[in-house]
Amino acid sequence: MIHIENIKLYRNEKLILDRLNWQVEKNQHWAILGLNGSGKTTLLKVINGYIWPNEGKVQVLGETYGETYIPKLRRRIGWVSNAMIDNLNWQDNAIEIVLSGKFGALRLFEEVSEAEIEEAVRIMKQFNCDHLANKTFEYLSQGERQRIQISRAIMANPDILILDEPCGGLDIIERENLLQTIEQIAGRENCPTLIYVTHHVEEILPCFQHVLLMKDGKDAATGTREQILTEPVLSNFFGRDVSLQIQRDRAWIAVK
């Protein structure tokens, strides 16, 4: 699904990604954990073909970057992020935002069929946001906007769905509701490969069986959640002693 081989990326002579390696296989769901400035979002931009590494090899969905037509490939990758929200037209109704995902556009310019509208409503209903269909996007809460954005991504029937810090700015209730939505996606038949990016350990749901730790643009560690979500590994990663508890199959940490 994703093959990143020894990539290096510079911006203004600063090394952003440093000999990073990462491989995602079919039917795997991954969490990427890293502090601010670790290179997480830059890696996502590389995967989506928005920026190119200076060295190394990138393959996504069997296509090698530099040898394929990126805009066409990009339609097979859903990306949910706060940066994407800012690019949407906030004056559109929620269902128009969702329908735009069908065409890989930021606005709905195409004529849509009754079947496509029904599909959008069905997807929104799965994520408990169909009642928002005719609401103006601008007046939705942050949590509601994230549900609409996820519905928009699913509308395109992607092979990979990237969730870039989707809980950022949410209160604890909205966060848990959104995480429940993500669990629902993971439990769906023919679910896309999920990539969940965060700097909060407790957001790594049980469905994310593999974890990539990123630090200073490097792959600090990769492995199963059982291998990575341990006190020794996380203490070394954060550079501080942490205690870890497992509650509801999720890891919760505190600095000692």
Feature locations, PLM:
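Conserved structural motif at the start of ABC-family nucleotide-binding domains
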Residues: I2, I16-R19
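Helix-to-loop junction immediately C-terminal to a conserved catalytic motif
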Residues: N48
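Conserved ABC transporter NBD signature motif
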Residues: G56-G66, L73
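Conserved ABC ATPase "signature" region
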Residues: L99, E114-L132
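Conserved ABC ATPase signature
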Residues: T136-L140
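Catalytic Walker B motif of ABC-type/P-loop ATPase nucleotide-binding domains
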Residues: L161-D164
